[in-house]
């Protein structure tokens, strides 16, 4: 299964950008959740503005869908500067990055999503740019080649990554501010759903927002996607009114259970329980058993299941916890509770 095809995928889906921009908060005061990150960023941004400096380079890590791009937009808005956006895989050559850097105005924000996927040659260009606001460009080749330096205006690089451990130490060390976004609590997600409903002019009750929030896997992107699908259901079956009962019926129809698990989550957990007697099972064997890439399991499926206590990672492999057995009404080792 392609990850982007999953309703419960935290990955961005083509076509959602327009709606996401409409409901995305623009200021720190509108950003819900992540209180420690917000408190720190408010201080860092205010201090930089008071000094008249560019904000220190910022690295934002965390699972997909938690608001890394939103936070980058907010940083630019709060600093009152332009935001230039790109991603690691897009910057194939050093010249691609050089072109973006030389187009920046003083204190602008350059946002690089998936920064862990930068090629080594592009990353080398970043080092002097981040540290000294300079570009080192080679003119010519061989013995006749020479290096010239191009001065850059002070700017802020905001890098986003789902795999902070994959960044090289020289790159990671050049970020003055490092923030990690965590999965959201249900209460914060409920506020996000309610806010998005207002932006989209939807009729939703507090109970309806809470039901969507508690099945959204701690992820705002999923919560907003579920809200749109529940809206469709409500418009056809409930005159557009999203109550808790309507939300429950819609989400059950979409095969999203009370824990926010979809088919792939249940497939992963049941593979560990049934095919590997609860584990431990190695990642490669587990990937083969469910027909998924190991990276998809590590980066997409596992984080939420581990955070919620349904899977444990051990030196010998993955283990299904007692919570996983109880979720499926099983005793440990896959026996029937009756």
Swiss-Prot record:
ATP binds at residues 23-24, 65, 68-70, 131-133, 174, 184, 221. Keywords: ATP-binding, Cytoplasm, DNA damage, DNA recombination, DNA repair, DNA-binding, Hydrolase, Nucleotide-binding. DNA binds at residues 294, 313, 318. GO terms for biological process: DNA recombination; DNA repair. InterPro entries: AAA+_ATPase, AAA_lid_4, DNA_helicase_Holl-junc_RuvB, P-loop_NTPase, RuvB-like_N, RuvB_C, WH-like_DNA-bd_sf, WH_DNA-bd_sf. One of its GO terms (molecular function) is four-way junction DNA binding. The RuvA-RuvB-RuvC complex processes Holliday junction (HJ) DNA during genetic recombination and DNA repair, while the RuvA-RuvB complex plays an important role in the rescue of blocked DNA replication forks via replication fork reversal (RFR). RuvA specifically binds to HJ cruciform DNA, conferring on it an open structure. The RuvB hexamer acts as an ATP-dependent pump, pulling dsDNA into and through the RuvAB complex. RuvB forms 2 homohexamers on either side of HJ DNA bound by 1 or 2 RuvA tetramers; 4 subunits per hexamer contact DNA at a time. This is Holliday junction branch migration complex subunit RuvB.
């Amino acid at each position: 299964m392609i990850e982007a095809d999953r309703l419960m995928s935290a990955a961005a889906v083509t076509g959602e950008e327009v709606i996401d921009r409409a409901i995305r908060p623009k200021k720190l005061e509108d950003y819900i959740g992540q209180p420690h990150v917000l408190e720190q960023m408010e201080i860092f941004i205010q201090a930089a503005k008071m000094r008249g400096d560019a904000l220190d380079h910022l690295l934002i890590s965390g699972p997909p869908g938690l608001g890394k791009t939103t936070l980058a937009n907010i940083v630019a808005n709060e600093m009152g500067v332009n935001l230039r956006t790109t991603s690691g895989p897009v910057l194939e050559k050093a010249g691609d990055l050089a072109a973006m850097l030389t187009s920046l105005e003083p204190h602008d924000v350059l946002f690089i999503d998936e920064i862990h996927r930068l090629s080594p040659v592009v990353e080398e260009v970043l080092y002097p740019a981040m540290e000294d606001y300079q570009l080192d460009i080679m003119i010519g080749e061989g013995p006749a080649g020479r290096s010239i330096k191009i001065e850059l205006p002070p700017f802020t690089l905001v890098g986003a990554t789902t795999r902070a451990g994959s960044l090289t130490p020289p790159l990671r060390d050049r970020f003055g501010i490092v923030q990690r976004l965590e999965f959201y609590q249900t209460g914060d997600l409920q506020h996000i759903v309610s806010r998005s409903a207002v932006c989209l002019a939807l009729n939703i009750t507090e109970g309806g927002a809470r039901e969507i929030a508690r099945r959204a896997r701690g992820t705002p992107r999923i919560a907003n996607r579920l809200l749109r699908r529940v809206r469709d259901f409500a418009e056809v079956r409930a005159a557009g009114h999203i109550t808790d009962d309507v939300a429950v019926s819609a989400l059950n129809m979409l095969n999203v259970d009370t824990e926010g698990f979809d088919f792939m989550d249940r497939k992963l957990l049941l593979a560990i329980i049934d095919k590997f007697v609860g584990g431990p099972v190695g990642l490669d064997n587990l990937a083969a058993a469910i027909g998924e890439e190991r990276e998809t399991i590590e980066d997409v499926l596992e984080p939420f299941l581990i955070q919620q206590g349904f899977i444990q990672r051990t030196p010998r492999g993955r283990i299904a916890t007692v919570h996983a057995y109880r979720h499926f009404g099983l005793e440990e080792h896959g026996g029937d509770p009756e």
